[in-house]
Amino acid sequence: MPLTVNCPICKTPVEWVPQSEFKPFCSERCKMIDLGDWASEKHAIPVKSEFDLDALDELGYDEESFFKE
């Protein structure tokens, strides 16, 4: 008996077999909806910020003088 997973978009059961062309999605439509969600940044991979915002505050710049220099 093959493994069955739910489509991440519509929750339709999908058999995890080589014949399942769009796995883990049930269809091209659900695959494209997911791609659109990534492209519009509805999904994102969390990463640690490169910047320490507290350290930036310690530099002593205020917004007005920073842009005038």
UniProtKB/Swiss-Prot annotation:
Co-factor binding details: Binds 1 zinc ion.
Cofactor(s) required for function per UniProt: Zn(2+)
Gene Ontology MF terms: DNA topoisomerase type II (double strand cut, ATP-hydrolyzing) inhibitor activity; zinc ion binding
Keyword set, alphabetical order: Metal-binding, Zinc
Keyword Nucleotide-binding among UniProt keywords: no
GO biological process, one term: regulation of DNA-templated transcription
Origin superkingdom: Bacteria
Annotated residues for binding of Zn(2+): 7, 10, 26, 30
Cross-referenced InterPro entries: DNA_gyrase_inhibitor_YacG, Znf_NHR/GATA
HAMAP family: DNA_gyrase_inhibitor_YacG
Function: Inhibits all the catalytic activities of DNA gyrase by preventing its interaction with DNA. Acts by binding directly to the C-terminal domain of GyrB, which probably disrupts DNA binding by the gyrase.
Binding partners and assembly: Interacts with GyrB.
Protein family: Belongs to the DNA gyrase inhibitor YacG family.
Protein name: DNA gyrase inhibitor YacG
Organism: Shewanella sp. (strain ANA-3)
Gene that produces this protein: yacG
